[in-house]
């Protein structure tokens, strides 16, 4: 006799695919996940995953020295991100994340799909709301939304070039209250706030990206292939 064998479905979740249908169909199911989300250990990545990961899973998948920061409060028009009390990733919640290891290939693991969305919102002393919004599928940003580039700078999206305002899935972006003059925000590491540089407008010509050979790539949108590029006279690497 052959014992019954339980077949667990493989659910692919990709940063470049519309995951809406497959996440809805598997909401609440414990499945084998195939995750395609490239991550760099050289800068803060924004993440938002449709599943929970505990400390053991994070250490196994991304390395024990991986760092997580969550949006905690607003102080002096700055969004402050701190290390969470527990090293864990909650489904649908946006984070800043820096893995110990660069992640270039697919990851395979067991997890329960949770198709929720928990945008993190905090108000300043005047009651104005600052939002850190996670997305699990490619999403079109509005002109006033802000994303974090691979150079750890903040950018408004390019609304003039078709498709340039779309960020890939399993990321997060920032929504500031209307009329706010906030130009920076802070990552708080072990009680020390490190400010990330001024917000840039990707519609400006001084944010044009070129290859190292001088070929024009286009305006910076945070979604460049691997390589060495030049922007504003400075070289930077996308891994």
Q: Which residue ranges define each predicted feature?
A:
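Intrinsic disorder/low-complexity signal
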Residues: 2-3, 113, 203
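Short alpha-helix capping/helix-loop boundary micro-motifs
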Residues: 79-83, 216-217
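Extracellular carbohydrate recognition
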Residues: 1-9
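A short, polar beta-strand/turn micro-motif
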Residues: 10-62, 82-153, 158-196, 238-239
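C-terminal outer-membrane/trafficking sorting elements
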Residues: 70-74, 192-239
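Surface-exposed, low-complexity/disordered Ser/Thr/Gly/Pro/Asn-rich loops and linkers
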Residues: 64-78
